[in-house]
UniProtKB/Swiss-Prot annotation:
Organism: Bacillus mycoides (strain KBAB4) (Bacillus weihenstephanensis)
Gene Ontology molecular function: DNA binding; DNA ligase (NAD+) activity; metal ion binding
Lineage: Bacteria, Bacillati, Bacillota, Bacilli, Bacillales
Protein name in the entry: DNA ligase
Manganese in keyword set: yes
Pfam families: BRCT, DNA_ligase_aden, DNA_ligase_OB, DNA_ligase_ZBD, HHH_2, HHH_5
Active site: 116
Length: 669
């Protein structure tokens, strides 16, 4: 390929990938599959490596993470990043309104209300449309240069839709589902977990290695325009519209309010809706919309007089910690859990809260009998915030982690660079039981009627010890168990039989190979098509697959380099368990009669087995249309985890709602 052709192709790929990023991460309406995006990205990376003279600082390839830094350089903000004054109740809001009206002659003041994202405030500098620098807020005067890490956030445009010079400000955050997934991975790996999504976002964005930030699935909402050359915008609401037109992601839930009564109604509305968002908010920001009035009101040394932050009441309660129980996960990690006197937190009754590891118990000086403050991290996971030391009587008991596994009494170990204690006995009954529960779960073999309770009964009766044992179960054995009758036993035997027909990716995920989640299992299944081919793969072969890193490749090779595992696979074959990929390929979908033909479909939330862009591609290949919002013309909403407000919209318009499992069933017909 000549240099001229290479340069032209590089420019084409950059434009394409920038468009795809904008559609997916800002509009929430992807137009291509993950596979197509990955192919284009790999082609761009290859061409740039072969032609380094054409490398550009705003190339989408930068998003995978660049060179490891030694230190973050300091940056002085052109204008201070001021903090906001706080309001904690309705009276504080009315006082703010009164002060605003006292400061101006015009009695008509319009406010704009926005959700206060609980993340990390950053500034973004663009020169002639190109992203040149990003910095943390720091102390408001001086921040840190985190440009390389911000370039990994796909919601931040590297090039704007206009060649404009400006500074935008916003909040980088971690979605709740990403927070849960990250902590699960850290816990399985015996690492310290993050206390909440805000800490996770801040910790990720301040990594000296941008590749780590790139893996953390951060996002960002831009909430303001600090300055823009050669352009005057009369209101804050219009500046947000302008930022959206340039390609920034702005929060869609903002609202202009004509009176303080409207502001209070908005605050009350989002206090109720808050738990349904896939990101954390800790309040509402209220600003005077008119820029001329903002300038007239001015600022104090610390904060603007024309804006205030209403802070939601903390979702924290006090209860007594009555005990600490231990659980052994399928990877052998021993996790302490606080047993609590039942208490309502964020709308649900909480009886337990994870203590994660021994270091956390020591750090917080948690003792049995203590009164503790409890909240839900990310409005999801109950956690012990701190001990109320003033309530101690002297009768509280210090807790010491055991030296041996509570399930098998093998000695516990702490692996290098891990904070968790781990049982490394491969025959540990607790690990085997947890592995069996995972194997039959919804995203794995999906055996209806075979949940934790039944697995425990079968395990205790010594009917199952390996995954393959499930396929030798008889109706007679099931009838011996509590709560099993003729019909339920027959149904379960049939459900187990049906699971033999699952596609390869479900079996792979069910095996519980360390570091291999549902998405990676599907990637392996599509790539190799059969279990035999995957078993033969080398670490080098695995690492050539997009998004498969060294750690996962090593884990897969190690897993299959085990005689017991190979024996298990042989037993699966003898029982007739399918070990080939049966999923759909786009090319196979053309000219197929389908439910989706002529229908308008909306995808929302996180789809575990299939990414949304891939789902969109398959629906369109079957004659359907995928849109980004729910309306009267919508025929179907496919709702994954953390579906959010679109579920409520679907109910309002009487739109049919499917979960991911139902959606996959229809695709596989």
């Amino acid at each position: 390929m000549s240099k001229e052709i290479a340069k032209k192709r590089i420019e084409e790929l950059r434009d394409l990938l920038n468009t795809f990023n904008y559609q997916y991460h800002v509009l929430d309406n992807p137009s291509v599959s993950d596979a197509e995006y990955d192919r284009d990205m790999q082609e761009l990376i290859k061409l740039e490596a072969e032609n380094p003279e054409f490398m550009s600082e705003d190339s989408p390839s930068i998003r995978v993470g660049g060179t490891v830094l030694d230190i973050f350089e300091k940056v002085t903000h052109k204008s201070p990043m001021l903090s906001l004054g706080n309001a904690f109740n309705e009276g504080d809001l009315r006082d703010f309104d009164r002060r605003v009206h006292q400061g101006i002659d015009d009695a008509n003041v319009r406010y704009i209300c926005e959700l206060k994202i609980d993340g990390l405030a950053v500034s973004l500098h663009y020169e002639k449309g190109r992203f040149i620098q990003g910095a943390t807020r720091g102390d408001g005067i001086t921040g840190e240069d985190i440009t390389q890490n911000l370039k990994t956030i796909k919601a931040i445009p590297l090039r704007l839709n206009e060649e404009v010079t400006l500074e935008a400000r916003g909040e980088a955050y971690m979605p709740k589902r990403s927070f849960v997934k990250l902590n699960e991975e850290k816990e399985q790996n015996g690492e310290d977990v993050f206390a909440n999504p805000r800490n996770a976002a801040a910790g990720s964005i301040r990594q000296l290695d941008p590749k780590i930030a790139a893996k953390r699935n951060l996002s960002m909402f831009v909430y303001g325009l600090a300055n823009v050359e050669e352009k005057t915008i009369p209101s804050h609401s219009e500046s947000l519209d302008f930022l959206g037109e340039l390609g920034f992601k702005t929060n869609p839930n903002r609202r202009t309010c004509e009176t303080i009564e409207d502001v209070i109604a908005y605050v009350e509305e989002w206090q109720e809706k808050r738990p349904h968002l896939d990101y954390e908010i800790d309040g509402i920001v209220i600003k005077v919309d008119d820029v001329a009035i903002q300038e007239s009101l001015g600022t104090t040394a610390k904060s603007p007089r024309w804006a205030i932050a209403y802070k939601f009441p903390a979702e924290e309660v006090v209860t007594r910690l009555t005990g600490i129980e231990l659980s052994v996960g399928r990877t052998g990690v021993v996790t302490p859990t606080a047993e609590l006197e039942p208490v309502r937190v964020a709308g649900t009754i909480v009886r337990r809260a994870s203590l994660h590891n021994e270091d956390l118990i020591r750090e917080k000086d948690i003792r049995i009998g203590d009164y503790v403050v409890v909240k839900k991290a990310g409005d999801i996971i109950p956690e012990v915030v701190n001990v109320i030391f003033d309530k101690r009587t002297g009768e509280e008991e210090e807790y010491h982690m055991p030296t041996h596994c509570p399930a098998c009494e093998s000695e516990l170990v702490r692996l290098e660079e891990e904070v968790a204690l781990r049982c490394i006995n491969p025959t540990c009954p607790a690990q085997i039981r947890e592995g069996l529960i995972h194997f039959v779960s919804r995203n794995a073999m999906n055996i209806d009627g075979l949940g934790e309770r039944v697995i425990t009964q079968l395990f205790d009766a010594d009917y199952i010890r390996t995954f393959a044992d499930l396929y030798s179960l008889t109706k007679e054995q099931l009838l011996e168990l509590e709560r099993f009758g003729e019909k339920s036993a027959t149904n379960l035997v049939q459900a187990i039989e049906n699971s033999k027909e699952n596609s390869l990716e479900r079996l792979l995920f069910g095996l519980g190979i360390r570091h291999v989640g549902a998405k990676a299992a599907r990637t392996f299944a599509e790539h190799f098509e059969t279990m035999d081919e995957l078993v033969k793969a080398t670490e080098e072969e695995l690492k050539t697959i997009n998004e498969i890193g060294e750690k996962m490749a090593q884990s897969v090779v190690t897993y299959f380099d085990n005689e017991d595992v190979l024996e298990l696979l042989q037993q699966f074959k003898e029982y007739g368990v399918n070990m080939a990929y049966k999923g759909i390929k786009i090319a196979d979908l053309q000219n197929v009669e389908s439910y989706f033909a002529g229908k308008t479909v909306v995808l929302t939330g996180k789809l575990e087995v299939m990414g949304r862009s891939e789902a969109k591609k398959k629906i369109e290949a079957l004659g359907g249309k995928v849109t980004g919002s729910v309306s009267k013309s919508t025929d179907l909403l496919v709702a994954g985890e953390a579906a959010g407000s679109k579920l409520a919209q679907a109910e309002k318009h009487n739109v049919e709602v499917w979960n991911e499992e139902r959606f996959l069933q229809e695709l596989n017909k």
